[in-house]
Amino acid sequence: MELLSLGSRQRPSLHEIGLSIISLTTCFVCAFAVSFVALAIYRAHLHPLAAIPGPKLAALSSAWQAYHARNGRMLVLGKTLHAVYGPIVRVGPNEVWLNSPDAFRSIYGAGNGYEKSDFYLSTVLNKPAIDWGLNLHFPDTLDLLSEFDTRRYRLQRRLVGPVYQANNIKKFQNAVDDVIERAVAQLRTLDGAEVDLKEWMHIIVVECLGAVVLSWSPGYIAAETDGGTGTQSYLGWKRKSVFGLFPLVTTATFFSKGLGRLFSNLWGVTFPTPKNFKPFFTPVYHKSSKRINVALRQNAGSNTRPKPPKRKQDTQPNDLLTDLIQLHKAKAEFTEQYLRRMAITNFGAGHETMCSALTSIMAMVGSHPAVQGRIIDELGSHGYLPSTCTSKDQKPIAGQTHIDYDAAASLTYCLAAIKEAQRLYPVIGMSLSRKVPASGLSVHDVYIPPGTTVGCSPVSLHRNTTIFGDDASCFNPERWLQDNVEARRAMERYNLTWGGGGRTCPGRHLAEMVVWKVVPALLREFEVVVTKMPNDVEVEYYFMAMLTGVRARFIPRR
């Protein structure tokens, strides 16, 4: 009887269980609150970066910067942060933005040991393996933007370098000229109607890439739309800009898609695919894969039997993919996987960056009539006349038909306007972040410890008055034509238009060839009038940045 009584006393009641749960929950909440407060105090007052000025909330959590990135406010931050806090600003618990020539030289100088930061985990193309030490190991697939292995990256750049040199790229000018002719003809049919400038620049860029890389057209010019591909792709950068600021979360999402969806929903960066949406990457992948497969089969067959005489239809087209296939055949180090990835990378890396450049250039020139007028005078002095230009007796006036890539270098004012627009509205809207090496960083009388994420925002750096003059915030192409040689060299040196240090854009010459031909060609044929220029708050600027919301008219020149 006593045993039964003892057993009944040892069995807790529901009331006791409830009290225990409440007690444990209270302890957990208190412990969490104490830990949170302790972490906040440490980051705000005891952290090695605590003395660096910056927004107080930024010191506590990366959520501060992520909030602004999610809202597309990186243009505003780039223009205001350093104006308020000075050349060194703490923008996260372990991240610092800098804005000075000294900082630029330290971070982006060749051989200084500053590797890409963990922000780029959000841009990787392949799922990594993870070892027992929680270190990530990415496959060797030629992921140029997100490659963390410096030696591997240098090898990849050396391999593809000859294909993307200016002397090789310019042989594809005729393909770009054909696209320009079709774009001009189609824009003329609009008779000056208002258009979304970014969409039309994207149309032209994708058509140029299709022609240069694959001898193919997506049909965007004839359709007068990119099918929403530019907008949908840009939303992807909104997501990457947020995820990149939380590398631990990004790492976890490699192994848990559910966590990725949850985090996306939490930050409001989940974007459903529109109905009947057709990305251009699908036909690009199929067409490039088909040609590569045929070329590899032919190459394998040539090792076992004599080559039959080439028929006309068997000859390879004169495009970039043909060069990449030949590179694979000539160099074993340029593997089949490299070949397939590089064929797609031309589009993945090029369609948004070139669109961003063209949009900012046409927006700036179209909103500054005096600059546009001077460019037209320069084009006329070189014989580049509108295709519809006639004399007083209505007879066509013969002029230069196409603007040659090499000859474009003589259009000094036009190129100055191009540089100036890219300076003010760079392709990268956030910091080109790097990781401080073991030696640490001493700059502006501050020591920044190893492992800290540091970098310069191109938006900020390109408005630095020490480098670009007192009117650095103004659109003034003449700054690139000034007599002061040292000043011009400094502007070229401390410039992140094409990236920084050893990680500059590998497709720069391809992009320049397209931009240098498209801009003067469009201005020759049309008076570009910007009808809506959004203010800075309205522009959606992420890590990959574009001047959004610009409306313009292309009025045919008579």
Curated annotation (Swiss-Prot):
It is an enzyme of class 1 (oxidoreductase). This is Cytochrome P450 monooxygenase sdnT. Its EC number is 1.-.-.-. Residues 298-317 are annotated as: Disordered. Cytochrome P450 monooxygenase; part of the gene cluster that mediates the biosynthesis of sordarin and hypoxysordarin, glycoside antibiotics with a unique tetracyclic diterpene aglycone structure. First, the geranylgeranyl diphosphate synthase sdnC constructs GGDP from farnesyl diphosphate and isopentenyl diphosphate. The diterpene cyclase sdnA then catalyzes the cyclization of GGDP to afford cycloaraneosene. The keyword tRNA processing does not apply. PANTHER family: CYTOCHROME P450, P450, PUTATIVE (EUROFUNG)-RELATED. GO terms for molecular function: heme binding; iron ion binding; monooxygenase activity; oxidoreductase activity, acting on paired donors, with incorporation or reduction of molecular oxygen. The lineage of its organism: Eukaryota, Fungi, Dikarya, Ascomycota, Pezizomycotina. One of its GO terms (biological process) is antibiotic biosynthetic process. The keyword Phosphoprotein does not apply. It is a single-pass membrane protein. The chain crosses the membrane at residues 21-41. Its cofactor is heme. It comes from Sordaria araneosa (Pleurage araneosa). Its main location: membrane. Belongs to the cytochrome P450 family. The gene is sdnT.
